[in-house]
């Protein structure tokens, strides 16, 4: 995909965002896809969850002739002011370094995506640097968020712009004929922001959803949990709406991912979710616009403690259980491979009639 480095901003206002309405996927197509699965020469429901997932994809795309060969991974890169509180092993400079690696196609998700010919699209939505990075899309809302122990992470305007950016990027991909997209992110401190968002939305304690991130010590984990707990109490976030939670303790990457989930529902593109950060964003999107979850495909159950709670809240069932915690979109790209395998059966496998065997009946 040709790199669009010139800044593009999407002029949604908060009022315009509030007017968005989500239409459900095409249930008639869902039934057609399920019916086709039953004609294939295999046991009924032999492909398990993948039969219902492909039916969901068909319903989202609005056709039983499913084409997801053109795949993209939108990777939202942003810095988080909360790193000032010692909740991470590394500093903000790592966000910039990894974004540069992504531009060179050298990071983990890029290598995985190249192996299946999926396109990685790193997006600077809020890196704390004025440097322009060739190969990274410039959609910078602001150079990182604020320390949410001192003040809200974002202003209302910044939050709206970040959400709108995610929506707009999905539209750009739709116009370039992408059939399916995966969520990705890179931002030091974003397991802290996602934990705070998750705890607030699920009305649970910091300890229940805050993990070690990139590998904190016991002391570091305790500090991280205390930071999340203090923020929840200071702003009384257990009683706040989803937008306020996102603005107060979220990140620009999470806001962009929230917009991406909404954009998938608006432009009818299936969105494959990665790990807890993407799922926290998905929960924000679903709380803002009920029905968004119907356009989301889970990939893996990560090892962060929030993973199970988020999946349950979204009523999504990840199929990969490998204890992954790499981020970047790696689990979602792994799901791309499994979907391709399932689609090879759906689109090419012999039917009962072709092998002259009576079809199994339900």
Give residue ranges: language-model regions.
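N-terminal loops that bind phosphate or other acidic moieties
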Residues: 1-362
